């Protein structure tokens, strides 16, 4: 019923949308998903908070700047999309949703993240791109199961050394920031598979050949004087990428990566939890 709900709501004028949902949506959708993206909502209809078995809630592309405390009732929620809204601060009620695996916060007005974010210890994917972050909040380094971090299009100049704690992190997207050097902490993260530092101000790249898990490095649109050296089988996207990679120092299967894996804006259909 989640998809049918979206289709029905599309025929309701935006100023009547919230009233319609409150009065007519009486049962939780069978697929345990509610998608209210692009509905010009200024507040979350409280009735949604009564669907305690809800797993996926998409609120992207609205006019939200706060969330009701009743959202805490959704303790089975695994995916929450709040991107493309007007949040200047992350509502603390989000940090009570301890089953969250995927959290989309991109394209808001966030300058920081609350310490309470550390409570989301099941979080595996965090998108905080296109906000107003001048530094990566250290609380992110406490999300020990995090596998994917998208922090592109902010104003980051460096990364905290504590990031090395994230031993499950496989993909980090840092394009469109203010990095003047390749973040040293990434050299101590051997399990990283994808590193994107496109569109920064990095002039000199260190060798990445010692990172055994690396599959793809994107470094285009930097004023660099060299290409990062990588092990054989690692894909590079950027200037001088045709140079011969260094031989891999350990045996292992070569996994091909295509240019299609370069980060892009969040898709209309968000990925499922792993």
Where would I find each of the regions flagged by the language model?
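The feature captures the LRR N-terminal capping module
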Residues: 1-152, 157-161, 171, 184, ...
